[in-house]
Amino acid sequence: MPARAIMFQGTGSDVGKSLIVAGLARALTLRGLKVAPFKPQNMSNNAAVTADGGEIGRAQALQARAARRPMTVHMNPVLLKPQSEIGSQVVVQGRVIGNAKASAYQAMKPQLMKAVLDSFHHLIADTDIALVEGAGSASEINLRAGDIANMGFAQATQIPVVLIGDIDRGGVIASLVGTQAVLAPDDAALIAGFLVNKFRGDPALFASGMSEIATRTRWTSLGLIPHFADARRLPAEDALGLPGGGVWSRDRPKIAVLAYPRISNFDEFDPLRLEDGVDLQFLRPGTPIPGDAAVVILPGSKATIADLAALREAGWDIDLQAHLRRGGRVLGICGGYQMLGRMISDPDGHEGAPGAVAGLGLLDIETTLTGDKALRDVEGRLTQDEAPFRGYEMHIGRTDGPAAQHPFLVFSDGRRDGAVAAGGQIAGCYVHGLFADDHLRAHWLRGLGTTASGQSYDADVDATLDALAAHLERYIDIDRILDLARVPRAIT
C-alpha cells in the first residue's frame, strides 16, 4: 500500500509543531505503523549527526527517535544554521553547500525544492505514513513565492494540512481564522483541520472557541491539547525554548552556561539540567556569572568569532578571570573550546570577513577555521582518569598548540582531542553530547561533590515520549488525522 502523508503547519513559531509531530510519531508507532518524520526546511543551530554521515535538525532527531527509526539526512533535507542577522550556513541533504544571505537564499529555492522532493519520496518508499512539519508561520505570505517549507511543499505534493495555534500566547482564534484570511484560496483549501495547543484550565471554557473557529473556517476540529508539563524533559531545538535564568539554589553546585547569541547544540546540557544534585542555568548577555559558580561552560557556537565578541561585550571575560581566581572550573565545548585559546584565525572568511582575533588566552592553543566539517559519532576515554565517554563531533577548524599535548579526550581509534590546563581547572574539547552518557555524567558530577540521580537519560526521554503519545491519544482525534492523510502526488 502506498505511503500516506499529512502536514502540520503553525500560525507562528514555537506553537508546538515539533513536539506534536514527535508525540504523534510515537503514538502511531505504538499502534504498529511505520512512521517517517519529515521537515522540508529547518532553521536551527542545534543539529544531530545521522546514521548516513550527515546532519539534521535536533527536532527531527527526536522525531526519528519517537518513530523508532534511524536518523537519515532525508528527514530534513534543507537545514539553515544562522551565522548572522542576515545570513546562514546552508546544509542540503546533510552536507554544507555554503553560506547565503537571506536575499540570495530566495534565489536558491527552486533548486532546493528538487532536493526536498527527492528526499521526501526517498523517505516514504518504506513508510506507512509520513508526518510532515512546516516551518515558522503558514501566514508569511511575503515568503510564499518559491516557498519550500510550508504551502509550497503542500501544493507540490498535494497533501492535506493541519494548522496548529498556540492559545498560551493569546489570540488563538484570530491567529487561526486570520491565517485562512491571508492565504491564497488554493493554499487555504489544503487545510483540512486545526489543533489548539498549550491550553491551561477547564477545557469546557473554550468549547465555544473551538466551535467558533470551526464555523468560521469550515475546518475539522481535531483537538484542544492541554499544556504538557513534561515537555521540559525533552530536548529543545529553538533558542526560543532556551530556559532563562532564575533564582540560584543555595545548596547545590551552580553550573553557568553562557548563552551567547549564536549558541549551538545547547540541548546537550539537558541531562545535567535535569539532575537534582546541581543547578544549571543559561546566562543571557547582561547577566553576570555568579561569584560562587562551581563551573562555567562555554558551549558551541555557529559564529565563534562574533560570539566571542558578544562574550566580551557582556563582560564575561572579566567574570571568567575572577571565577578562576576563586578556584572555579571552566569547560569549553566546540566553539567554546576555540574561544579559550590564544587566537582564532579565519583566513578564508568562513564566518565573515577573513581575519584573526585574539581568544581568551586561557588555553595555550590556536585555531584555524577551515572548510572541512567533522561529522561523526565518537567514543573513547578521558585522559585524566580513564572514564569512558560517547559523543559526537560537529565542527569546522583545526586546533593545536602546547596545551593540546595534554588532551582532554582520547578516541577509541587513538586520536586525541581537546586540552587541559591548570591541573584540570580549565579544559576544552570538540566533542558534543558527553553528558548524555550516564556513566560520564555521574563521574563528572562526583568531581563537583554531588551524585547523579542514577536515572538513564535515554530511558527518561523514551518514557517522556511515551507519556506525550498517551497525552495526544487522549486529546487529539488521531483516527480522524489518519483518515485525512493522503497519498502524495508523484513528482517526476
From Swiss-Prot:
Catalytic residues, chain numbering: 334, 432
Keyword Protein biosynthesis: no
Keyword hit for Aminoacyl-tRNA synthetase: no
Pfam families named in the record: CbiA, GATase_3
Source superkingdom: Bacteria
Single GO BP term: cobalamin biosynthetic process
Pathway: Cofactor biosynthesis; adenosylcobalamin biosynthesis
Boundaries of every GATase cobBQ-type domain copy: 252-440
UniProt KW keywords: Cobalamin biosynthesis, Glutamine amidotransferase
Single Gene Ontology MF annotation: ABC-type vitamin B12 transporter activity
InterPro entries in alphabetical order: Class_I_gatase-like, CobQ/CobB/MinD/ParA_Nub-bd_dom, CobQ_GATase1, CobQ_synth, GATase_3, P-loop_NTPase
Function: Catalyzes amidations at positions B, D, E, and G on adenosylcobyrinic A,C-diamide. NH(2) groups are provided by glutamine, and one molecule of ATP is hydrogenolyzed for each amidation.
PANTHER family for this protein: COBYRIC ACID SYNTHASE, DETHIOBIOTIN SYNTHETASE
Family: Belongs to the CobB/CobQ family. CobQ subfamily.
Stated name of the protein: Cobyric acid synthase
Source organism of the structure: Bradyrhizobium sp. (strain BTAi1 / ATCC BAA-1182)
Gene that encodes the chain: cobQ
